[in-house]
């Protein structure tokens, strides 16, 4: 791969939108500390599979559900070296509506950060800056894409989550995308 991949999730959501605006491809996913540098003896199998695919091909063709969900680490100290994460078997994706298969490029990120792009309650100037520089993609840019949403450890209240979804609806996102993937919340 000749291009250097930009990887990350959650706190890097705005970075992804900014880099996309200037034409640089990004990959929403693996973060350095919790994924690439997993403290157990090896990287988690699901993470390793997609990380290696990205590094060898420069893209990720198909996202399949993990059959296992892992508890997030609360401590990244030396005592955690070689300690496996608690795991639980799952049945894969949970389909809420529509077809279980859809395709398109992924666009989205942490719903908390996306909310901040529209709402000034946390950062008063954020919505103005995002509008001024066109950081949030226009409705046409969402056409045929897959909206990816995940939540932060702040565990957004249901009313705020609903408001965030309403911002996306008002921006025409749901009418334009080919599908929506929502990450499993932490804990």
Which residues fall in each region the model found?
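Structural motif
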Residues: 7, 146-150, 181
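Conserved anion/nucleotide-ligand pocket segment
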Residues: 25-112
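C-terminal active-site/capping subdomain that shapes the small-molecule cofactor and substrate pocket
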Residues: 151, 155-187
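Short, acidic/small-residue loops that bind anionic groups at enzyme active sites
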Residues: 2-21, 25-33
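A general structural motif
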Residues: 3, 143-144, 175-177
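Oxyanion-binding "anion nests"
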Residues: 106-158
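Conserved active-site and cofactor/substrate-binding residues in soluble primary-metabolism enzymes
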Residues: 10, 14, 46, 105-113, ...
């Amino acid at each position: 791969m000749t291009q250097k991949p930009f990887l990350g999730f959650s706190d890097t959501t705005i970075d992804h939108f900014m880099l996309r605006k200037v034409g640089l491809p990004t990959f929403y996913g693996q973060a350095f500390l919790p994924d690439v540098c997993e403290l157990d003896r090896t990287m988690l199998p699901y993470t390793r599979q997609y990380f290696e695919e990205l590094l060898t091909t420069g893209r990720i063709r198909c996202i399949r559900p993990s059959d296992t969900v892992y508890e997030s680490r609360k401590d990244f100290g030396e005592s955690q070296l070689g300690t496996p994460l608690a795991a639980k078997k799952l049945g894969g994706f949970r389909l809420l509506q529509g077809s279980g298969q859809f395709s398109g490029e992924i666009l989205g990120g942490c719903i908390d950060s996306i909310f901040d792009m529209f709402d000034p309650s946390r950062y008063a100037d954020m919505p103005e800056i995002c509008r001024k520089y066109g950081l949030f993609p226009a409705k046409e840019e969402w056409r045929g894409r897959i909206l990816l949403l995940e939540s932060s450890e702040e565990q957004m209240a249901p009313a705020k989550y609903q408001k965030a979804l309403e911002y996306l609806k008002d921006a025409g996102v749901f009418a334009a995308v080919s599908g929506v993937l929502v990450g499993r919340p932490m804990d």
